[in-house]
UniProtKB/Swiss-Prot annotation:
Segments of this protein annotated with the region N-(5'-phosphoribosyl)anthranilate isomerase: 258-453
Keywords: Amino-acid biosynthesis, Aromatic amino acid biosynthesis, Decarboxylase, Isomerase, Lyase, Multifunctional enzyme, Tryptophan biosynthesis
Annotated PANTHER family: INDOLE-3-GLYCEROL-PHOSPHATE SYNTHASE (PTHR22854:SF2), TRYPTOPHAN BIOSYNTHESIS PROTEIN (PTHR22854)
CDD domains: IGPS, PRAI
Subunit structure: Monomer.
Lineage of producing organism: Bacteria, Pseudomonadati, Pseudomonadota, Gammaproteobacteria, Enterobacterales
Entry protein name: Tryptophan biosynthesis protein TrpCF
Pathway: Amino-acid biosynthesis; L-tryptophan biosynthesis; L-tryptophan from chorismate: step 3/5; Amino-acid biosynthesis; L-tryptophan biosynthesis; L-tryptophan from chorismate: step 4/5
Family according to the record: In the N-terminal section; belongs to the TrpC family.
Amino acid sequence: MMQTVLAKIVADKAIWVEARKQQQPLASFQNEVQPSTRHFYDALQGARTAFILECKKASPSKGVICDDFDPARIAAIYKHYASAISVLTDEKYFQGSFDFLPIVSQIAPQPILCKDFIIDPYQIYLARYYQADACLLMLSVLDDEQYRQLAAVAHSLKMGVLTEVSNEEELERAIALGAKVVGINNRDLRDLSIDLNRTRELAPKLGHNVTVISESGINTYAQVRELSHFADGFLIGSALMAHDDLHAAVRRVLLGENKVCGLTRGQDAKAAYDAGAIYGGLIFVATSPRCVNVEQAQEVMAAAPLQYVGVFRNHDIADVLDKAKVLSLVAVQLHGNEDQLYIDTLREALPAHVAIWKALSVGETLPARELQHVDKYVLDNGQGGSGQRFDWSLLNGQSLGNVLLAGGLGADNCVEAAQTGCAGLDFNSAVESQPGIKDARLLASVFQTLRAY
């Protein structure tokens, strides 16, 4: 039995459909509906994990997620990363619209999925008329006969169907109904709770001829890497929509929160950004072969829209504050013996939006991460720049959501590093041709390796 949130949404949807039929009768546009030429099923095939990225302004569980919602801007970013793009068209609960479909379709070449509570063939014709290439059919909402009828309409228009299940009974029905792409919703639409175990438990019951998509509650690279053993792809919306920097938000989930440190040239910053990095590191430590001054840093920054982090070691606080301000750094990374008093003083004087990162040297044991006002830790072997790794087995069982891993990371070991569960990786010497000179091919290779799952 459907109850609560879902039942209310479906009851309201029936009212909406009848009103829309009056306003825009099927007969007024059915002759103009052309079959889709973008193949949803094919787009999700292939060796790499697929990503259906979602345009979503609001949801019943979170309210408004994205204030300045602009489907054209979102599509222009998603088209660089997505296998398919999902567009919420439900008005009442998600502040969606069918008008968003052609906007997204015009900008992005990928198949467009109409995400709605579909209960009537009319909605599928409407979706295709507005340029959707696939539609969502939810087995929590439809009985088998309704599903067959709606799927047949979609397939007659050469549209794909994402068949959504949320429990074992619906999964068995999806198998019996011959669903080609099954979305396992980790959110229980009856009470809106999230349980990622649903993907782990249900996905293995589906055959190899079925494409499995894990939906809801996916918001980190560590989750994606782990769940990619169970699912062929992911549908991700809320985790992306809440961020101002959408490029960085997508990269964070697909590749991790990765940084390329020791940038000294604009072309290297561009190569790092093009490869998939989020952060660029600028080193202000005089003894480093990668040290830059403010003018050099500005040249580097002008070349690529990375989020820039300044690296300092036992600097005067006034110097750190000055560079953070002049360069609009997103974070300052402390590599010396800065203690709690130093960090407290710095925090009080820094603008609130500038984060404090602390590098810790790992020897025989893992140092404590108990400093106040530290937003991220960078775990390295020694003082950094050594090109050597520490014993990563020390990270087993640790909570690493605010940790970047550093020390000799390159294409040969970045996957093993990512599998530790750290938020991201910090690349430097192993992506260089000589100290301070990055190699664009090595950078590209590292990020291609990180995305090969």
